[in-house]
Amino acid sequence: MTSRLALFDQTLSASLLQRVNSDPHDYKAYKTRVKLKILEQRGEHGEKELKFEISRADDFEFLFAAILNNEKYQELAKAHELTVDFDTFPKVIIQHLLCKNIVKTADEDGIEVDARAKPGYHSIIENRGVPPTEINIKLEKDKNSCEFEIFSKTPISKGKIFAMSLQAVRGDLLIAHLLKICSSQSTKIATLHRSTDELAALKTKVAEMEKRNQSIEDLEKKIEEQEERIREMEDELELVKEERENIRVIAEEKEDLVAELQNDLESVNRELEENQEELEIVGKMLGEEQGKVDQLQKRNVAHQKELATLQRNFQKVESQLKRSSVEQSQQSLDIRKLRELEADLKEKDSMVENLTQTVGILKKELEDERVKMQETMTSFESLKVENESVKERLAMYRNQRFSPAPVGLQTTTIPSAGVGFKTVLGQNSPYANNPNMRTPFRDTSSALNTGLTYQNSITPLPNTTRFLMADDTTGSSVTNTPPVLRNPL
């Protein structure tokens, strides 16, 4: 034998029939996998031979072989009525008979693959038009030989295509076969050892990768937290920008409000000038009504009591201001205002003393001049006291026009202009019923309506209240004190 050519080397699905007794028809059958090799070789005289060899992976001693030359094939073809020649026979059985029974086997790496997909077996062509076949292997009881049979199967029958006898391989050939299997198993074991080492290395790498992945996950969480913090800081920055914009808008509104207050101050100054003119007119009218001052003497005592009440109210307000000054940041300004109020009170006390002295002088003059002169001087003193009351009422009227009274303090209701005018001048005064003399006072109802409109249109602010509290020409809305008469008659 000079050379060998492997025509077929695949694992087939077959039925193994093993005789259990001497009865030639009594077999024990079970499914198994056998490996079939078809080798093309040259004999001793150079003739072409086909070697059929079957083996099993689960039974190393299961090895049967048969050599088929042209002469033996002719006997086989005659016995089974084969229609192909010796050269075509292997190709036909491989492509049309054996291909239906090829099964997947595990390669050297332990992965199952279809042998038909391996390179080098291009001659295996699966013909879908060929009916399925069945392979039977009849094993003799002594296991020295077996019968290799191929059947064609139809839905209703099964027919034998051919059968050939294979002899058990023993001796050196079996030893060589076993050595080949051992070598293959050793190679697989070495491969498994390498795979085990690689698996251990991979496990170590996997553990390292898991640690890295865990650290990466921690970093990702930290990054997410940082991103969330950045978003929160951006939101806070937007809020700060909005607050700055709101502060700017409020500052502009405050500037506009200050400008409006300045305009209001100018208008108040103009009204004060007008009120001064009105006071001058009232002074002239009071001079003409000196004869009626005797009726006002009795009111002096009542006004003295009212002054004492005002002083008590002033003391209460002073104590309240002291308590509130501790809580306010502008303590120095409140103290200065308190001093101004004290100065106003002293000035008003001096006015009361002056009025009292004037009353005494008038009493002396009334004693010198007879009963009429005495009544005139008494009326004159009473008229002066009533003048202060009128000024106080005018101041209270201004306070009610320009700003509301502070919380907790009582306000004095302004009497109607007509009633107060008649009370001061008397029923027998030539100016009492003269409509022309009412012009300097302006219409009381319109003034009240104007004051209400002005009060509703302008919201009083603390600065406005402080201005009115500190203005000694209009009096104080806190202590309910009358205004200071700059040019007393």
Curated annotation (Swiss-Prot):
GO terms assigned for molecular function: identical protein binding; protein domain specific binding
Keywords assigned by UniProt, alphabetized: Cell cycle, Coiled coil, Cytoplasm, Cytoskeleton, Developmental protein
Gene3D superfamilies, per the entry: 6.10.140.2140, Spindle assembly abnormal protein 6, N-terminal domain
Region of interest: Disordered: 470-489
Broad class of where this protein is predominantly found: cytoplasm
InterPro entries listed in its UniProt record: Sas-6_helical, SAS-6_N, SAS-6_N_sf
Biological function: Central scaffolding component of the centrioles ensuring their 9-fold symmetry. Required for centrosome biogenesis and duplication.
Complex formation: Nine homodimers form a cartwheel structure with an internal diameter of 23 nM and radial spokes connecting to the microtubule triplets. Interacts with sas-5.
Entry text on domains: The coiled coil domain is necessary and sufficient for interaction with sas-5. The 35 nM long coiled-coil domain mediates homodimerization while the globular N-terminus links the dimers at an angle of 40 degrees to form the inner ring.
Protein name, as recorded: Spindle assembly abnormal protein 6
Gene assigned in the entry: sas-6
